[in-house]
Curated annotation (Swiss-Prot):
Annotated catalysed reactions: N-succinyl-(2S,6S)-2,6-diaminopimelate + H2O = (2S,6S)-2,6-diaminopimelate + succinate
UniProt xrefs under InterPro entries: ArgE/DapE_CS, Bact_exopeptidase_dim_dom, DapE_proteobac, Peptidase_M20, Peptidase_M20_dimer, Peptidase_M20A
Organism expressing this protein natively: Rhizorhabdus wittichii (strain DSM 6014 / CCUG 31198 / JCM 15750 / NBRC 105917 / EY 4224 / RW1) (Sphingomonas wittichii)
Protein name: Succinyl-diaminopimelate desuccinylase
Coiled-coil region(s): none
Family: Belongs to the peptidase M20A family. DapE subfamily.
Molecular function GO labels: acetylornithine deacetylase activity; cobalt ion binding; succinyl-diaminopimelate desuccinylase activity; zinc ion binding
Domain of life: Bacteria
Main function: Catalyzes the hydrolysis of N-succinyl-L,L-diaminopimelic acid (SDAP), forming succinate and LL-2,6-diaminopimelate (DAP), an intermediate involved in the bacterial biosynthesis of lysine and meso-diaminopimelic acid, an essential component of bacterial cell walls.
Amino acid sequence: MIDPLDLTQRLIACPSVTPADAGAMAVIATALESIGFTVHRFAAGEAPDGPVENLFAIRGQGGPHFAFAGHSDVVPPGDGWTSDPFVPEIRGELLHGRGAVDMKGAIAAFIAAAARLGDHPGTISLIITGDEEGPATFGTVALIDWMKARGLCPDLCLVGEPTSTHRLGDMVKIGRRGSVNMWIENVGTQGHVAYPHLAANPIPALVKALDALAALHLDDGNAWFQPSNLEITTVDVGNAATNVIPAVARARLNIRFNDEHRGADLVELVRRTVAEHAPAATVRAVISGESFITPPGDFSALISAAIMKVTGLTPELSTTGGTSDARFLSKLCPVVEFGLCNATMHKLDEAVAIPDLHALADIYEDIVRTVLAHPGA
C-alpha cells in the first residue's frame, strides 16, 4: 500500500519549479513501478523553456482505458514563507509545502488509490508532465503526440487540478474557457512636444482603438459558461520625459472566451477593430487554448456519486477559472477535472488538509473502480 501523505511529502521535497524536475519524476516512477505500472519517461524541448520531463505510466490491458493527468512542476515559492517551501512541514492537520495542493497531493492520492485496486479489468494510465505551470509547450502536448503514435489514447481522463473551493468535493470542472493573448503596437514619429507638426503621436489612435475594444460586447454567456471578457492588461509608451512625443505606443490584452467563439475569430475581430481606429498598428496574437466542455453525463455523474459517497457533498459542475492542460486532453477524449481545495494554491504557506489527502484517494479509488467495472460509463 502507498500512503498519500508520505508520497506527497516526498514530492514536495523535490523543488520542481517549472521547468526543473529536481527528482520529482523519479519519485513518481518508483512509486508506480512498485505497484505494477510500466513507466515511460522522456524529455522534450530545449532551454529556456525546457528540457521538460514527461512521464506516461500504464497498467492492465484492453478497455476501458482510464487516464489520470497531472503535473509535477510548481510555481516559484516567493519570499515570506513561515517554513522552507520545499521542506514539507506538518502543523496540526495541515501539510505545508509548495505543490501540496497544486498538484502533488492529487498525484499522490491517485497513486495511492491505484495501489488499492489490485487486479482489475481494463487499463489505467497516468499522464504526468513537468510543463504545466510554464509555457505548456513541451509537456502534455508532447505526451499526447507520444500516446497517439503508440495507440495509447484513453477513453476517459480525469485531471487532478485543485478544483474544490471551500470544501473537498464542492466543485468539479467539466470545461474551461479559452484564452488568447494579443499585443498591439502603433508606431509614430518621435519629436518635441512644442513642435507637434514635426512628429506623429502614436498614442491617440491607440487609445481610440483600445476604447473600441473595451466597448465590445462578445456574448451573454450560456448555460455552462459565463460571458466572454476582454481585458486590457498593459498600456506602455516607455517615455519618462515630459517634453517628448513618443515614437511608439504598445498595449496588451487577454480574452477569456466561452464556446460561443473560436480563438481565430476573436483575433480577427480585434484586428478589424484596431484597423478602424489605428490603421498603422500591428497586432500579434497567441491562442493558448480553445474553450471546451464535457457535457454532463455518465462520467460527471459517477464522479459526483463518488464525491457524495465520501464527503456527503453534491459538487457543482463548473467551467470557471483559468486554463489547464485539460484543454489539450479534451481533444483526445471526455475529460473532467477534480482535486483538492485551491484556496492556498500559488500562495505563501500553501497547504493541504491531511484528511483531504486520504479522502481524495478514497474518491479516486471509487471513480476508477466504477469506470473499469462499467465500460459504458
